[in-house]
Amino acid sequence: MNRTFALFISLFLSMTLYSQIHEVGIFLGGSNYIGDVGPTTYITPSEPAFGILYKWNKSPRHAYRFSYTQSKITSNDLDSKEPSRSQRGYRFENSIKEVSLGLEFNFFDFDLHQLERKITPYVYSGISYFRYDELYVVSGETRTEERANSFAIPMIVGIKSNITPSLILALEVGTRYSITDNLDGSNPKSERLKPLQFGNINNNDWYVFSGLTLTYTFGKKPCYCAE
C-alpha cells in the first residue's frame, strides 16, 4: 500500500495551498465482520484496527474526508447462538486494507476558529476501496486463493469535540457494506470452487470499524461564504 501513503501525502500538500482549515490525525479502534460465519452481532470489535485520516473543512457543517484504515477480521461459528452455525464449526481470518473518500456532515456548526468548547454529532459516507484475501473452505479448513480488491459503501456515525484549540477527539462507529460476499470464504469467485459455496449467497458481507479519532487542526482562518 505504498501508493496509498504517497496519495495521502500528495493530497495533504495540495490542500495546504488553500485557505480552508485542515485536520490530520489517527484512528485507533477495533473491527468486526457480519456475514455467513460466526455470530451476527453488529458491533463487536474483536480485532485491533488503526488508520490515518485527513479532513478539508469547507464550512462549519461539512468537510471532505480521506482515510486509510487496516485491520484483521475474524469470526468463528462456535461463538454463534444459531445451532446450525455452531454445529458447522467454520472459522476464518482475513486482512482488510481500505482507502475511503467522502463527505462528513456536522449536525451543529463546528467552527474550528472559535475557541470555546464545541461538540456535535456527525455522519459520513462516500466510497471505499479495499484489498482482502479471496478465501474458500474445504473439509472445514479455510484456505486463501488469491489477493483481491473490491468496493464498499461506508456509513459512519460519530460525535466529536475540540479538547484543545488544536486537537479534536471523536468517537465513531462505521459500517461498510462491501460489494463482495466472500470475506469469509462462503462464496468464492472461481468457477472451479463454486461447489464449495455455503450460506446465503444473495447477501454481501459487511465489516465494521469502531473507535476513536484524534486530529490536529491547522490552516488560515477561512471565509465561510458562498463561492
Regions found by a protein language model. Give the residues of each.
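Residues that define the transmembrane beta-barrel architecture of outer-membrane proteins
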Residues: 44-48, 95-99, 119, 145-153, ...
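Predominantly the C-terminal beta-signal and adjacent terminal strand-loop region
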Residues: 78, 163-227
